[in-house]
Every structure is written in C-alpha cells, then in structure tokens.
Amino acid sequence: MAKNRFNQHWLHDHINDPYVKMAQREGYRARAAYKLKEIDEQDKLIRPGQVIVDLGATPGSWSQYARNKLAQGKKRDTEREGGIDGTIVALDILPMEPIADVHFLQGDFREDEVLHQLEEVLEGRDVDLVISDMAPNLSGVASADAARIEHLCDLALEFAQNHLKPDGALLVKCFHGSGYSQIVEKFKQQFKTVAPRKPKASRDKSSETFILGRHLKRPR
C-alpha cells in the first residue's frame, strides 16, 4: 500500500513537473536536457567545432541538447536535419533512437570493439568535452550505492584521461553522500579546475549533483 502511494505521488509530481512539460513541448526525450542546458549556460561548455562524447547517453536528451547547440543556422529544432558544426558521439549499452547528426555506438565503452568504432568516428581527433549522466541502479544500501556511483565516475575519469584534449572538460553526475568527497578528490588529482554544479532542473529532494573538471593536469 505504501509503495502504491509512493508511485502515485511520484506520478503526480512527474506529470506536473514544469521541466517535464517543457521537454515535451520542445521535443526533448527527458527533462535531463535542462540540467545540461543550465550548466552549459553558466560554464560555456559547448561551442561550435567541438568534438563531444556523451557517455551513458540513452535516452538521448543530453545529445539532443548538444546537437542543437552545434546546429548550423538560426533555426535549432530538436530533430531538424541539416548538419552541425562539430561532432557528437553518444555511447550506451542500451539502445537509443537515432538523433540527427549524432553518431550512436551501442556497447560498453571499455571494450576494444566499441573503442575501435569510436576511433573510426573521431578520425584521430581528441575530444573537447565528455559528458556523463550515467547513474547506477540504486539498491538503497548506502555503502553499496556509493561504490557503484564512484565506479561510474572512475570510468568517466579514465575515459576522459585517455581521450580529452589538454584543455578539455568532463562533466559527470554523482550524488552527495558517502563517497562524494573521494570522487571530488579524484577530479582534483586529474583536473586543474574542479567545481560542483546543482542545476535547478535537479529535483529538490534529490541528492544528485554534477562535477565539472576542466584542463587536464597530466595530458596524454
């Protein structure tokens, strides 16, 4: 009974969420697009000509937003064909519906086959920006969840170290709580500038936050 009440409350909040309504109106697949939008507007992350990699991209709202920023011309409809000034590669182990001008690679980005496909798309270019909205399936056990969250951040950090330009940036999702300070410390070891970000589009009750690292300390 309590679970049903929880589901009803969640559904009510979701339906009445202004970001959900905005996403539906503007053609985004998820409200998460507005988290990236707010951070991008604050930090000027996405610029014409960039190479951007979106880790854990499904369902694709972050790639949609990045695509819109790189779209040529004044009109930036979410699914408008017409090319972009830059390259976007989206990766996920789950399938994703196609997005115009976005290269999607399905598979684990730690595997050689997927990395080979990525290298073919990049054509020898380093990456300007890595974005990751990845989140584990949470169990409710704090220690286990902290380890899973930290693991995903570690994967993103390793990927960034191997593919970013020296002045590139990495934006990842994490959660306040056990293990958060360790994640921040790892970012500080790898990047010259590290800053937390809590966009308004993040739900008030959520411990979700984002960490932005810029300028590698030890480029490849």
Curated annotation (Swiss-Prot):
Keywords for this protein: Cytoplasm, Methyltransferase, rRNA processing, S-adenosyl-L-methionine, Transferase
GO cellular component, one term: cytoplasm
Classification via InterPro entries: RNA_methyltr_RlmE, RNA_MeTrfase_FtsJ_dom, rRNA-MeTfrase_E, SAM-dependent_MTases_sf
Binding site for S-adenosyl-L-methionine: G60, W62, D92, D108, D133
Enzyme class: transferase
EC number(s) stated in the UniProt entry for this protein: 2.1.1.166
One annotated GO molecular function: rRNA (uridine-2'-O-)-methyltransferase activity
Cystine connections: none
Localization terms from the record: Cytoplasm
Coiled-coil regions listed: none
Annotated region described as Disordered, given as residue ranges: 195-220
Tagged with keyword Cytoplasm: yes
PANTHER family named in the record: RIBOSOMAL RNA METHYLTRANSFERASE (PTHR10920), RRNA METHYLTRANSFERASE 2, MITOCHONDRIAL (PTHR10920:SF18)
Job of this protein: Specifically methylates the uridine in position 2552 of 23S rRNA at the 2'-O position of the ribose in the fully assembled 50S ribosomal subunit.
Similarity remark: Belongs to the class I-like SAM-binding methyltransferase superfamily. RNA methyltransferase RlmE family.
Protein name: Ribosomal RNA large subunit methyltransferase E
Gene encoding the protein: rlmE
